[in-house]
């Protein structure tokens, strides 16, 4: 079912060729149901690839969703032209008065930097607080998840001895949780991070949903702040990890082969996507839970009144 995105957004053609139903504004205006309002705060330099990955998953439900692409005031992007940002993205200041049913905060390639040294950290603090008054439920991804856990719960992170890089088996700890309905008992998840979070610093308001003996916690649910934290990358394409590997090799970096990615550990071969179905199922479940619990009157989002 449909997602509504800007008519000229390049991701539109990619999504349509994959069979994703993309709706234009004139068609959506004739429907009587209230579209769900979702925002995507895209912190990645390659905006087009990231927005396509998340739009693909957000579009996988029978619900009409209006997706607003959001960026911080600092463009962050050397690979995305300014006119592209002007045409398709709003700054957070542009949308801070709006209400959203769902909001996604992506990762960012700044894993080795203390949070407080990130140049847009003051704006991130405002955004994370703003989700409590203007968003019904938020999903934080990778660095975004670590940042939110640090700010909202004081969760500590630490640098691992070796980068977790590849596709790892994970255990589902609560198959009855609304976000994990239909999940198998274990799943393959793409991982690319240097840091992990300290379990001992988790607050009682946080429930671990997906975990791994090899690379640590994958996903948590936050009952207090209406949020989910996905520390890894179910949204990734087949080639996301492979592209990262080849990029680093070409740059002369000593990069290990991604674990369990290439068939026969041959980096010339196309990786197989073994996580796609769980990625779609996670977003279907998450969006359905939002649909079931969000106020019909959008202005009541974040007020606790409906």
From Swiss-Prot:
It comes from Pelagibacterium halotolerans (strain DSM 22347 / JCM 15775 / CGMCC 1.7692 / B2). This is Homoserine O-succinyltransferase. The active site is at 142 (acyl-thioester intermediate), 233 (proton acceptor), 235. It catalyses: L-homoserine + succinyl-CoA = O-succinyl-L-homoserine + CoA. Its main location: cytoplasm. Substrate binds at residues 163, 192, 247. SUPFAM superfamilies: Class I glutamine amidotransferase-like. GO terms for biological process: L-methionine biosynthetic process from homoserine via O-succinyl-L-homoserine and cystathionine. It is an enzyme of class 2 (transferase). It holds the Pfam family HTS. GO terms for molecular function: homoserine O-acetyltransferase activity; homoserine O-succinyltransferase activity. GO terms for cellular component: cytoplasm. Transfers a succinyl group from succinyl-CoA to L-homoserine, forming succinyl-L-homoserine. NCBIfam families: metA. It comes from the Bacteria. It is found in: Cytoplasm. Its EC number is 2.3.1.46. The record marks 192 as: Important for substrate specificity. Pathway: Amino-acid biosynthesis; L-methionine biosynthesis via de novo pathway; O-succinyl-L-homoserine from L-homoserine: step 1/1.
């Amino acid at each position: 079912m449909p997602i509504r995105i800007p008519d000229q957004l390049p991701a539109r053609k990619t999504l349509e060729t994959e069979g994703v139903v993309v709706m234009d504004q004139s068609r959506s205006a004739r429907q009587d149901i209230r579209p769900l309002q979702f925002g995507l705060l895209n912190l990645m330099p390659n905006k087009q690839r990231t927005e396509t990955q998340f739009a693909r998953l957000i579009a996988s439900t029978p619900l009409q969703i209006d997706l607003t692409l959001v960026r911080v005031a600092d463009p962050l992007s050397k690979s995305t032209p300014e006119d592209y940002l002007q045409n398709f993205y709003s700054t957070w200041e542009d949308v801070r008065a709006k209400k959203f049913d769902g909001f996604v905060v992506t990762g960012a390639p700044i894993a080795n930097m203390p949070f407080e040294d990130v140049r847009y950290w003051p704006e991130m603090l405002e955004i994370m607080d703003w989700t409590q008054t203007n968003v019904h439920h938020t999903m934080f991804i990778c660095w975004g998840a670590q940042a939110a856990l640090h700010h909202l719960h004081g969760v500590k992170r630490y640098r691992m001895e070796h980068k977790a890089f590849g596709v790892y088996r994970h255990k589902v700890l609560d198959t009855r949780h609304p976000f994990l309905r239909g999940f198998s008992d274990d799943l393959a998840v793409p991982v690319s991070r240097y840091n992990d979070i300290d379990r001992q610093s988790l607050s009682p308001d946080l429930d671990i949903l997906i975990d791994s003996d090899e690379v640590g916690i994958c996903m948590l649910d936050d009952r207090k702040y209406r949020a989910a934290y996905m520390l890894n990358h179910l949204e990734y394409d087949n080639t996301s990890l492979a592209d990262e590997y080849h990029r680093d090799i070409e740059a002369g970096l000593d990069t290990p082969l991604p674990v369990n990615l290439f068939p026969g550990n041959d980096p010339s071969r196309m990786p197989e996507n073994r996580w796609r179905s769980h990625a779609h199922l996670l977003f279907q479940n998450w969006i359905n839970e939002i649909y079931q619990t969000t106020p019909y009157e959008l202005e009541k989002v974040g007020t606790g009144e409906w």
